[in-house]
Amino acid sequence: MDQIRPGAGGREPGAGRGAVGAASPVDVVDLARSLIDIESTTGNEGEVGAWLASYLRGRGYSVLEQPLQPLAGPRSEVPGSRFPAPGPRINVIAAVGEPEVVFSTHFDCVPPFFPSRVDGDLLYGRGACDAKGILASQVAAAERLRAKGETRVGLVFVGGEERGSDGAKAANRIASKSKFLINGEPTELRLGAATRGAFRVRLRAKGKAAHSGYPELGESAIDKLIDCLVALRDAPWPADSLLGTTHYTIGLISGGVAPNVISPHAEAEVFFRTVGEHQPLRDILHRVLANRVEIEEILELPAVRMHTVPGFDTAVFSYFSDVPFLSNWGRPLLIGPGTIHVAHTDREHIAIADLDRAVETYATLAATLLAS
């Protein structure tokens, strides 16, 4: 396992740094904007990671820059990005003492990049709420605690969350004695009691091509696929008292070769947001479709139940996070400012007041956990 290594004590990017090793207040909006303005579409997180590592070293943290494997092929070649090909990638792991509580989130973002701007009381930009604003508030909370002499709080910031959580999986190889992991995602500052899992499948139907004037000579793969998709609507999907009933979306569908040809092939991708073990869902899927289509499993992530703390509002969420892949960092909690409903959109933003509230919430939550 990797170990956190002492940093070189480099210079913090930007102005306003106090003495190296001494905690000083963090301008959470300024830090968030500095992070947002560095493009870090998944696969190209190296620049923002290096900037953040230097920033934390300048504040006296020991920092590990943990290398990540490049993403393969065109997945990293995003139209409109200034990165023509996959670049270097790192996680940033930091501490000033022996962490018992760690703040964690991700600094990769979905495309397309757009820079920060402040409009009234809102901060806009890619990553404003998912999750660079969260990262800034976690750093500010850690510094607030450190100013009071509390050094048992660490920082685990990763890449790759938006495409398979490879950063979290790498970070989980680090030896840690941390007791609690506070992971940041947009929850409107409510503790996540649970998050749904994910189960994505590709359904492939095969038919027989024929002239459309003589459909009786062929077999339509599109008709087969439609029948199967309709059958999914009435299936008795698994339910859970906390998370509710499994639901799904049909995100992609394609098939056929020409309008005047009976389709020889068709396929669709179905994305289930799950509430428990996946085998019952798998059994229902195979029973309902009854060998009419080929089922290819593409993605499987578990539903997760998390630690909660009295006095904090809780909620359940339909998205998933890095939490399942960071089990070595302690009992998981999920909380962050902002709403998931504007994440991944061209209007992504966060209220500046929510960033300030998040600093206080994170500091209070960490102190409560440390006292326990």
Role assignments for model-derived ranges:
Residues D2-A23, S76-A85, A147:
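Short, basic, low-complexity termini and linkers enriched in Ser/Thr/Gly/Pro
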Residues V20-Y124, L334:
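Acidic/His- and Gly-rich active-site-bordering loop/insert found
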Residues A23, P186, L191-A193, R200-S372:
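Metal-dependent amide/peptide-bond hydrolase catalytic core
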Residues S104-T105, V156-V158, L181-E185, R204-K206, ...:
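Short beta-strand segments
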Residues P111-P112, L122-S137, H211:
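Glycine/serine-rich anion-binding loops at beta->alpha junctions
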Residues A131-K132, A136-R200, D240-S241:
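Acidic/histidine-rich catalytic neighborhood of metal-dependent amide-processing enzymes
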